[in-house]
Amino acid sequence: MDRRIVKAAEEGNIYAMLSLAYMHHRGIDSEFDPLLAIEEYKRSASRGCTRAKWELAKIYRDGDIVEPNPYEFMHWLTAAADAGIPEAMMELVVRYWCGGLVLKDPSMAFEWLRKVAEQNYPLGEFFMGCAYLQGWNVEKDAAEAEAYFQRAREHGDADLFIRFGRNFEFGMAGIEVDLERAKYWYKCAADMGSDRGYYSLLAVEKVAKGGRYETPEERDRSFNDLPSVQEVRRRNKMLEEGDIHMEQGYYDKAVDRYMKAADLGNAEALYMLAILYHDGEIVRRNDDISYDYLDRAAIAGSTDAQLQLGKIYEEGRGRKQDRERALEMYAMAVANGNLIGYYELSRFMDHPEKFVRQRYRIVR
């Protein structure tokens, strides 16, 4: 385990505590230890780390590493929402709207929805638009609805747009069916290069012309035949075969499979090749090739590559020293779900969570 992080946690760095919790939670550089992970999350949360509060809420909600606990879940969910975590705020909207763990309270749901939309969180902006469109605990206002929908479009991504389109196409999440609005959101996704968005757009246009209406389940099955989904399967298969060959000692075959997976954009394969070309034990060492693969891995979403590039730019190893580029890489890793990036950022600033949110609307 990274001694820097351990030492910083001992000295009271709440983001080092968060990183330790994450590492125990995910089994990174340590044994998987759910109880120790929760202990570190709580230590971090009790000292003011808002992300730790949200992680605890999810742990007690999902029950993946400990038994679900509705009381602990609501405690940490409310704490995370009060601290301004938009994902927690959005979850609280649903809880107050539907009732169950809390008394059903549409007014409270709307108030939390308004707060999360004010943070430019696209999911909140979309449902705020729906609230004004359909009169959910507020007077209908078409102009306000369109304004919020426009904001959601500016801040969202293709996956969200498909979700919005499905809500209007199939009448999900309490939204009235509106095929024209469904087409609008599917087109937004298609314009960003999503073949799922394009397929859904064509499907709705066929329905408008009298064609057969697909169910959501049928739509999902149709997605399985799309080129993007088939490509993901191929590259994952190549990666899996590469790992098997590597474990068995068939290194030439392993490298071949990793290269094929990398050519299809697999982030893990790209990162593996970056490591192999840097180590020089299985292939001849070539740092130029290694850095190229590392760049591509980071772009493809490898948080390991993003953290490593952050360190490279920070220290000026093999690249010109660039503090701003280093911070961007650390923030990118966080946005893609690697909480160790918070510790790296905390060495440069007091509020790394705000820094990340200023750059990324959607943080995993």
Task: Show where each model-derived region lies.
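Terminal, low-structured helical/coil segments at or just beyond the last alpha-helical repeat
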Residues: 200-230, 341-364
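Alpha-helical segment of the N-proximal tetratricopeptide repeat
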Residues: 3-11, 15-29, 234-253, 260
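Canonical positions in the second alpha-helix
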Residues: 8, 43-44, 79-80, 115-116, ...
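TPR/TPR-like (Sel1-like) alpha-helical repeat modules
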Residues: 180-195, 202, 206, 219-220, ...
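Structural signature of tandem alpha-helical TPR/SEL1-like repeats
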Residues: 2-3, 31-40, 67-76, 103-112, ...
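Short helix-capping/linker turns of helical repeat alpha-solenoids
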Residues: 10-13, 26-28, 46-49, 62-64, ...
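Hydrophobic face of amphipathic alpha-helices that form TPR/SEL1-like repeat modules
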Residues: 19-26, 55-62, 91-98, 102, ...
